[in-house]
Structures are given as structure tokens and as C-alpha cells.
């Protein structure tokens, strides 16, 4: 009975981990055109998050002579995090320094003359999915259900951090929206005041003009 409970518990944790890790690791397939086209992928990531990615060219039309691509990864502020040229496969890894949109772009060098577009696979992992759990298990001598519980704990912490990040972003956006609305309201009041002053001055001018001409 105890063994069955452990087995069922292990299966439950495995299923939970599978669904929770979907958003933290994903494989992306890009079709890059041959005529100087660039394909980019982006991800909104908070600060202090580990990001790992492998990319590789898949050419079904010419598997023996795989074409090369160039790649560049930039931070939200435009800092260069990774740059390689003319490779068939590569990898980049970094820890985010600031929250925001991280951009990875891939393109074919114009000197290559290809008849067909190429397919590029990008295995993008971040946060808890990028952690080397085999090394953790060997270092701390844990396995089975205990290891899965440790992974589940890490996932819960990561999800909580993401929720806090979303909450903070929402508060920032709300503050910006309130500030903008306040400025628009003051601008409307000032515009109305200017219109009243202009209309009043026009009325006074016309009144003086008519008095001068003895029309009234």
C-alpha cells in the first residue's frame, strides 16, 4: 500500500510538473526566407531570471550541406547579449539584469544563395526550466519524489515571483494611466479657460468698437 501511494504521488507530481513547466520551456520553429529576411522571437522576462536557448538549422532539401545563419540577442535597453555569424547551430545563456522584452533575431547572410527558405529550431528555456536538476540531485543526494517536490517548490516560487511582477507592472500602468488622465483633465481645463478668455476679449473689443462707431 505504501509503495502504491508513493507511485501515485510520484505520478501526480509528474503531471503537475508537466503542466507547470509548459510556460517555462518551449520549442519554436521559424522559417527564415532566403532573400535577406530576418525572423525574431521575443519574451517578456522579469529581472534575475536565467535564460538558456539552443538553436539549430534544419534543412530537409539539403541535409548534407546545411546552410548557416547569424543570430543576435538584445536586452530591453538594446544591450548586446549574444551575437554569432554563419553557424548551423548555437547556444546562448544569460541572467536578465532588467525586466522587459528580450529579443532574439536570426537571419541568413546575403552572400548565401539558397533556393528554398530554411527552418530554424529554437529551444528556449528560462527560470526553473533552465535549472540543471540532475546536478542538484547529485549534489544534494536526492531523488524520486523528493526531487520532484524540490522542483515543484521551485516552480511555485517562480510562479509567485511572476505574479508579483505582473502585479507591480499593473500598478505601474495604473499609475501612468492616472497621471495621464490627470494631465489630460488639467489640459482640458486650461484649454477651456483660454477659450473663455479669448471669447471675453473679443466681446470687449466688439463692444468698444460699436461704442466708438456709435452703433450702440
Curated annotation (Swiss-Prot):
**What's in the domain note?**
The cytoplasmic C-terminal domain contains a functional dilysine-retrieval motif, which is involved in the retrograde Golgi-to-ER transport of the protein.
Primary localisation category: endoplasmic reticulum
Q: Which residues cross the membrane?
A: 184-204
Tell me the first and last residues of the signal peptide: 1-27
Annotated GO CC locations? cis-Golgi network; COPII-coated ER to Golgi transport vesicle; endoplasmic reticulum; endoplasmic reticulum membrane
Name listed for the protein in its UniProt record? Transmembrane emp24 domain-containing protein p24delta5
Subunit annotation: Probably oligomerizes with other members of the EMP24/GP25L family. Associates with the COPI vesicle coat (coatomer). Associates with the COPII vesicle coat (coatomer). Interacts with p24beta2.
GO BP terms: protein transport; vesicle-mediated transport
On this chain, the residues bearing Omega-N-methylated arginine are 169, 174
**Cytoplasmic topological domain:** 205-216
Q: In what residue span(s) does the GOLD domain sit?
A: 38-151
> Where are the coiled-coil regions?
137-159
Q: Where is this motif: COPI vesicle coat-binding?
A: 209-216
UniProt-annotated location(s): Endoplasmic reticulum membrane
Task: Give the SMART domains listed for this entry.
Answer: EMP24_GP25L
Membrane side Lumenal: residue ranges: 28-183
| Membrane topology value | Single-pass type I membrane protein
Q: Into which family does the record put it?
A: Belongs to the EMP24/GP25L family.
Annotated motif COPII vesicle coat-binding, positions = 209-210
Carbohydrate attachment sites? 86
Record keywords: Coiled coil, Endoplasmic reticulum, ER-Golgi transport, Glycoprotein, Membrane, Methylation, Protein transport, Signal, Transmembrane, Transmembrane helix, Transport
Source organism per UniProt:
Arabidopsis thaliana
Q: Cross-referenced InterPro entries, in alphabetical order?
A: Emp24-like, GOLD_dom
Q: What functional role does this protein have?
A: Involved in vesicular protein trafficking. Mainly functions in the early secretory pathway. Thought to act as cargo receptor at the lumenal side for incorporation of secretory cargo molecules into transport vesicles and to be involved in vesicle coat formation at the cytoplasmic side. Interacts with p24beta2 at endoplasmic reticulum export sites for endoplasmic reticulum exit and coupled transport to the Golgi apparatus. Once in the Golgi, interacts very efficiently with the COPI machinery for retrograde transport back to the endoplasmic reticulum.
